[in-house]
């Protein structure tokens, strides 16, 4: 496997649903890159997913990654729940459709070429990189520029 990369992610939503944003910090050796984007109308879970997706999609070749998130929804979803969702045709155990299926499918595609160690940290607990991502996500949520078409199309 290629380079060893650290990815830190966070999502934010003002209202849930409401304006939202994601923040990503990528680190390779001594190099760091930050990414963020704001959306007019979305949810916190969609922004948490987008942060992980964008972080992974930014990489141009297969990597060994430690991805750190403060979202149990993202971490458990991608490491545990997704396997049964796929077996059931993207349905939960109660036969209802998986929420945010567009992003789960995109994340599933994004992880396929990487070796990823998914780590969880408690949000707002002084974890430096998580705090930086939170600041990026909140700033993006406060200045949205994009439409989350997946949220608009999949709303009940």
UniProtKB/Swiss-Prot annotation:
PROSITE patterns: RNASE_H_1. Binds 1 Mg(2+) ion per subunit. May bind a second metal ion at a regulatory site, or after substrate binding. One of its GO terms (biological process) is DNA replication, removal of RNA primer. It holds the Pfam family RNase_H. This is Ribonuclease H. CDD domains: RNase_HI_prokaryote_like. GO terms for cellular component: cytoplasm. GO terms for molecular function: magnesium ion binding; nucleic acid binding; RNA-DNA hybrid ribonuclease activity. Its EC number is 3.1.26.4. SUPFAM superfamilies: Ribonuclease H-like (SSF53098). It is an enzyme of class 3 (hydrolase). It comes from Photorhabdus laumondii subsp. laumondii (strain DSM 15139 / CIP 105565 / TT01) (Photorhabdus luminescens subsp. laumondii). Keywords: Cytoplasm, Endonuclease, Hydrolase, Magnesium, Metal-binding, Nuclease. The keyword Protease does not apply. It comes from the Bacteria. It catalyses: Endonucleolytic cleavage to 5'-phosphomonoester.
């Amino acid at each position: 496997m290629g380079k060893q990369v650290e990815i830190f992610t966070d999502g934010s939503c003002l209202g849930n649903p409401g304006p939202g944003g994601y923040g990503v910090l990528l680190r390779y050796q001594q190099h760091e890159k930050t990414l963020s984007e704001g959306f007019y109308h979305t949810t916190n879970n969609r922004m948490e997913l987008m942060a992980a997706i964008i972080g992974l999609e930014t990489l141009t070749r297969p990597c060994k990654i430690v991805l750190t998130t403060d979202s149990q929804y993202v971490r458990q979803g991608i490491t545990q729940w997704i396997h049964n969702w796929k077996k059931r045709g993207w349905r939960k155990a109660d036969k209802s459709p998986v929420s945010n299926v567009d992003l789960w499918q995109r994340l599933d595609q994004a992880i396929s070429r990487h070796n990823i160690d998914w780590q969880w940290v408690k949000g707002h607990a002084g974890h430096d990189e998580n705090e930086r991502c939170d600041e990026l996500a909140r700033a993006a949520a406060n200045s949205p520029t994009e439409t989350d078409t997946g949220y608009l199309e999949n709303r009940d």
